[in-house]
A protein has these predicted regions:
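Metal-dependent amide/peptide-bond hydrolase catalytic core
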Residues: 8, 263-449
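Short, conserved charged micro-motifs
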Residues: 92-93, 253, 312-317
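N-terminal capping segment at the start of a domain
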Residues: 23-51, 156-157, 249, 356, ...
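Glycine/charged-rich beta-loop-alpha catalytic/anionic-binding loops adjacent to active sites
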Residues: 147-162, 246-250, 380, 412-416
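Acidic-glycine-rich active-site phosphate/pyrophosphate-binding loop
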Residues: 134-154, 232-244, 374-375, 406
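Active-site metal-coordination/substrate-binding segment of hydrolases
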Residues: 91-192, 197
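Acidic/histidine-rich catalytic neighborhood of metal-dependent amide-processing enzymes
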Residues: 147-236, 278-292, 296, 303-310, ...
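A non-catalytic alpha/beta surface segment that caps or lines the substrate-entry region
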Residues: 45-94, 98-100, 104
Length: 449
C-alpha cells in the first residue's frame, strides 16, 4: 500500500475468488480519490464544471488512466475525462461497452477537507469523531440496520467533519482498478471498453456535453447505485421549479393596505402543497415536492423546488399542481386592497431535468443489460436487487440520447452526509462483478439495433 495512507497497512490480506493485486489496490485508490475535493456548486451551475476543484479530480483520474496504458485519454476544458481500452484477443468484434462515473461529490454538506478512515466494525454504535459543531458523530444500527450484517468488516468512513465521497468516487476507483486488473492480465476476456468520468452529476448536468460519437459505445452502465447488489433501471422523472415573488416594501407602521410581503406569498404557496408529499414522508415509488431553498425579504423572494415521480402521469400532475398553487395565490393577492395594479405577485418557471430511463432500458432490445448484470452479480455470489432509484443518474439522460445505461452498485451507504461509509468487502467485490460483466459481453453478445 502507498505509504501516504498508513491507515490502510493493517488491513491484512483479503482472498476472493478473483482476488489479485489490482483488487486490493481499489481501497488505496478509493481513499486517495476521496481526499481530492471535488464538490459541484449549484450556484454556478451554468458553468461546466461548476467548481474548479473538479478539474483537480479529473487530472488525477486522467493521470491514473495514462499510467495504466489506457488509449485516447482525454481531459477536456469541461473536466470530462474519456478513454478507451482495447478488447481482449478474440473479442474484437463484440460491441463496445461503456462505463460512466461522476467526478463530483454532493454539495449539500461539507466536502473539504475529507479525512477517510478505515475502521473495523465490531458491532453496536461506532463513533467516527466529532462534527464541525463539536457533537459526536457515530454509525448506529438503529438508523442503519444493515450494520448488523457488517460486524467484523472493515468500513471506509468519514471522521465526522465531511461527507466521504463514495458517491461516486467508489465507482471511479472500481473502474480504474478493473483496468489495472486487465493490464496485469490481458487474457481476461473483455470487449473494447469506453470509459467516461464526468462532472456535475450532483446538480443535474446529466453528462450533457459527453460526445457519444467519440465515445463509440453501443450501450453501457453507470455505476452510481447504493449498497452491493443494488441495480437500477428505473429513475424518477425530474423537474426543477423556481418561484419568484415581487412584493412592495413600506414602513411597517404604515403598511396597512399597502405592503405586499414577497416572502409571505411564497409561504402561502408552500401551504397549498400536500404535506405528505415531502421527501421525509415518502418511499419506494412515492413521488414528492422538495423545497430545496427559500430566500428573500419583503420586496423580493425566491423558492426553489424539485419535483419527482416515477410515474409520468403523476409527474405531470405534480407540475400542474404547483402551477395551480401559484395561480391561486396570485388570485388571492389580486383581491387585496394592496393589489399591485393587476401585476401578479408570483411567477413560476418549471424545467424538466430528466425522465425515467425505464422507458428505454425496459425495451426488449435492451433487456440484455438487465440480464447480464444479474448474471455478473450471481457469478460473484451476490443477489441482484432491482430497485426503483429515488433519484437520477447520468444514465437517465444518456439513455434518451441513445446510449442505454442502467445503474450498477457503487456500494456507498448514507450518501450526501457525514455518516457516509463504504464497506471494503463491497468495494472489492464490485471489481469482481465488473470483471464478470465484461466477460459476459466478451462472449459475443450480439444485439440487433
Amino acid at each position: 500500500m502507498n505509504d501516504a495512507y498508513p491507515q490502510l497497512k493493517a488491513l491484512g490480506e483479503r482472498n476472493h475468488h478473483m482476488a489479485s493485486k489490482a483488487t486490493s489496490d481499489v481501497l488505496e485508490r478509493f481513499v486517495r480519490y476521496c481526499e481530492v475535493p471535488s464538490q459541484s456548486d449549484p450556484r454556478t451551475a451554468t458553468a461546466v464544471p461548476s467548481a474548479p476543484a473538479q478539474v483537480d479530480m479529473a487530472r488525477v483520474v486522467a493521470s491514473d488512466l495514462r499510467d495504466l496504458g489506457a488509449k485516447n485519454v482525454t481531459l477536456d476544458e469541461h473536466a470530462y475525462v474519456t478513454a478507451h481500452w482495447p478488447a481482449s484477443a478474440g473479442a474484437e468484434k463484440c460491441p463496445t461497452l461503456a462505463f460512466c462515473c461522476h467526478l463530483d461529490t454532493a454539495w449539500q454538506t461539507y466536502g473539504s477537507p475529507v479525512h477517510p478512515q478505515v475502521k473495523r466494525y465490531e458491532g453496536g454504535r461506532m463513533v467516527l469523531g466529532c462534527g464541525r459543531d463539536g457533537a459526536e458523530v457515530a454509525l448506529d444500527p438503529a438508523s442503519n440496520p444493515e450494520l448488523k450484517d457488517l460486524v467484523g468488516e472493515d468500513l471506509v468512513t468519514t471522521d465526522g467533519t465531511s461527507l466521504l465521497g463514495g458517491d461516486d468516487k467508489a465507482a471511479v476507483a472500481m473502474v480504474v482498478s478493473l483496468l489495472a486488473r486487465l493490464a496485469e492480465n490481458p487474457s481476461i476476456p473483455h470487449p473494447a471498453l469506453a470509459l467516461a468520468f464526468v462532472p456535475d452529476e450532483e446538480i443535474g448536468h446529466g453528462a450533457a456535453l459527453l460526445d457519444l460519437d467519440a465515445l463509440g459505445a453501443a450501450y453501457g452502465y453507470t455505476i452510481d447505485a447504493g449498497p452491493l447488489g443494488e441495480f437500477c433501471y428505473e429513475t424518477f422523472n425530474a423537474a426543477e421549479a423556481v418561484i419568484r415573488a415581487n412584493g412592495r416594501s413600506v414602513h411597517t407602521g404604515t403598511a396597512k393596505n399597502v405592503m405586499v410581503n414577497a416572502s409571505e406569498a411564497l409561504l402561502r404557496v408552500h401551504q397549498l402543497i400536500p404535506a405528505e408529499d415531502r421527501p421525509e414522508f415518502t418511499q419506494d415509488r412515492e413521488g414528492f415536492f422538495y423545497l430545496e431553498r427559500i430566500e428573500g425579504d419583503c420586496e423580493d423572494a425566491r423558492a426553489d423546488y424539485i419535483i419527482r415521480d416515477h410515474d409520468r402521469t403523476r409527474f405531470e400532475a405534480r407540475k400542474a399542481l404547483l402551477r395551480s398553487a401559484v395561480a391561486q395565490v396570485n388570485a388571492e393577492y389580486a383581491l387585496r386592497p394592496s393589489a399591485r395594479d393587476g401585476q401578479p405577485v408570483l411567477s413560476i418557471d418549471i424545467s424538466d431535468q430528466y425522465r425515467n430511463m425505464a422507458e428505454v432500458i425496459a425495451r426488449p432490445e435492451n433487456a440484455h443489460l438487465i440480464e447480464s448484470a444479474r448474471r455478473a452479480y450471481a457469478a460473484c455470489g451476490v443477489t441482484m436487487r432491482a430497485v426503483p432509484m429515488r433519484g437520477g443518474t447520468d444514465g437517465a439522460q444518456l439513455s434518451f440520447r441513445g446510449l442505454p445505461c442502467p445503474n450498477l452498485s457503487a456500494c456507498y451507504h448514507n450518501a450526501h452526509g457525514v455518516t457516509e461509509f463504504v464497506p471494503v468487502r463491497e468495494l472489492e467485490t464490485m471489481v469482481d462483478v465488473l470483471q464478470a460483466l465484461v466477460g459476459i459481453y466478451a462472449e459475443g453478445y450480439q444485439v440487433e439495433r
